[in-house]
Amino acid sequence: MTTAPNESAAAVFLGRDGTLMREVNYCSDPKQVEIFPGVPEALLRLKKAGYKLIVISNQAGIGRGYFTEPQYRLVEAEVARAVLPATFDGVYFCPDRPDRATDRRKPAPGMIFEAQRDQKIDLARSFFIGDKAIDVECGRNAGVRTILVRTGYGANETQANPDWITDNLSAAAEIILNLNEVSRAK
């Protein structure tokens, strides 16, 4: 799937903690980053199929004063390094605390809409992969298809009613790539 210069691209929006990497309570140290097995390869397959890869992450630890934005950026850089050779097209985060209602904090779709504007994304052809009910809700609120992975909190959040539930990011990528094959065959 390639896009012409004036055409919108499809994207895969990704939760970070519990989806790409093992859940760490308020991860503020790059040494705590532990990418799940198969994640770099799955991301690379999606990238090669033409999907933009965009991380959408709540980072309330900043708003609560548990860590600083520079500390968050160091963790973000380690995640990016750990998934090479795949690369992210964008990383969007919301530092707000949960008690502050904003249009950016998941489950609100503000970060997805921001990425859509920045990256010329066709939401109708896009997906959100996450391990939490708020990831599924965020994706639904933005009008994208949703996949709940059972890594992180996902094993306990199946009531979120995603479009698909799967064990991990590799299996989620397989679903997307198979759907892509079916749509190209039509």
Regions found by a protein language model. Name each.
Residues 2-54:
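Active-site neighborhood of HAD-like aspartate-dependent phosphohydrolases
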Residues 2-8, 69-90, 98-128, 132-186:
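Asp-based, Mg2+/Mn2+-dependent phosphohydrolase catalytic module
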Residues 13, 56, 60, 125, ...:
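Short, flexible coil/turn micro-motifs enriched in small/turn-prone residues
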Residues 14, 31-35, 51, 92-93, ...:
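Broad hydrophobic/π-residue packing in well-ordered secondary structure
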Residues 16-37, 62-71, 84-86, 96-103:
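Metal-dependent phosphoesterase signature
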